[in-house]
Amino acid sequence: MEEQPLCTLSVKDLMEAGAHFGHQTRRWNPKMKLYIFEEKNGLYIINLAKTLYQLRNALPHVCKVIKENKPILFVGTKKQAKCVIKEAAIEAGEYFVAERWLGGMLTNMATIRNSIKTLDKIEKDLTQNSSCLTKKEIALLAKRHQKLLKNLEGIRYLRKIPGLVIVVDPSYEKIAVAEAKKLGIPVLALVDTNCDPTPIDYVVPCNDDSLKSIRLIISAIKDNIINTKKKLGVEIVSPIKTLSTEDGSEEIDIAAGDDNRKEDLLAKKYDSNEAN
C-alpha cells in the first residue's frame, strides 16, 4: 500500500490562523456554499473540517506530480501571498510567480523565453563585458536587469510545462488559472468565499487574505514536496541563482527585491571601469 502524504494540521491550527474567516455575505459566490459553515456578523465562516479534508485529498496529487518528475508552479502575486509563495517555492526547489503574471507565461512560452534571453544577455554584459562599459551604461543595464528579473526570476529555469499550478486566490490570479486550464494543467488553489471554485481541480477553502492562513496551508504543501523529494533521493535545487562578477571576488544575490540596493552594488562593482 502506497504511503500517504503527511498532514499534521488540525482544525485548531487552521482556526488559530484565521483560516475560517470568509468574505462579507454580500460578496460571496454561491458556488462556495458547499464549503461554508455559517454566517456570523455579516461574514461567512468557512467549514474548516472541509478545508482539512480537501487539503488531505489534494496532497497525494502534489506528491504524484513530484514522482512523475514534473515541475510545480506556485502563483501568488497579491501582497499577502507573494513572500510566502516565493519562500515556499525556493525551499521546495520549485518555480514561482510572485510579482506579476505576464500574459502568456504558460500559453506563449516562446515570447517569455525571449525575455529570459534578454535577461541572460544583460547578465553576461555585466559579468563578462564590464570592461567595455561605462558606469552609466552599467547603471542602466542594472536597472533593466532588475525590472526583468523581478517578473521572471521564479520561472527563469522552467524548461517544461508544469504538472501542477498552485494558486493563492484564483479570482485574483484568473489569467494564470485560465492559461493552466487551456493547457490542461491541474490547478490546486486556496479559495475564499468570493471565488468561483468551478475551474479549480483541487479546492482548499480558506481565508486567502490572511498571511497566517496562507502561510500555514502553503507550508503544509511545501513540506510534502520536500519530504517526497527526500524519499525519492531528488536533489532540491533553488529556482534562482547568484550573479558572479567578472573577477570572481564577490557574488551578488540576484533574487529580485531591494532594486535600488542591487543596482548600486552592480554599479559600484564596476566603478573602476571609467577610470581604466
UniProtKB/Swiss-Prot annotation:
The keyword Transferase does not apply. GO terms for molecular function: structural constituent of ribosome. Pfam families: Ribosomal_S2. InterPro entries: Ribosomal_uS2, Ribosomal_uS2_bac/mit/plastid, Ribosomal_uS2_CS, Ribosomal_uS2_flav_dom_sf. GO terms for biological process: translation. The keyword Ribonucleoprotein applies. PROSITE patterns: RIBOSOMAL_S2_1 (PS00962), RIBOSOMAL_S2_2 (PS00963). Keywords: Ribonucleoprotein, Ribosomal protein. One of its GO terms (cellular component) is cytosolic small ribosomal subunit. It comes from the Bacteria. Belongs to the universal ribosomal protein uS2 family. NCBIfam families: rpsB_bact. This is Small ribosomal subunit protein uS2. It comes from Chlamydia caviae (strain ATCC VR-813 / DSM 19441 / 03DC25 / GPIC) (Chlamydophila caviae). The gene is rpsB.
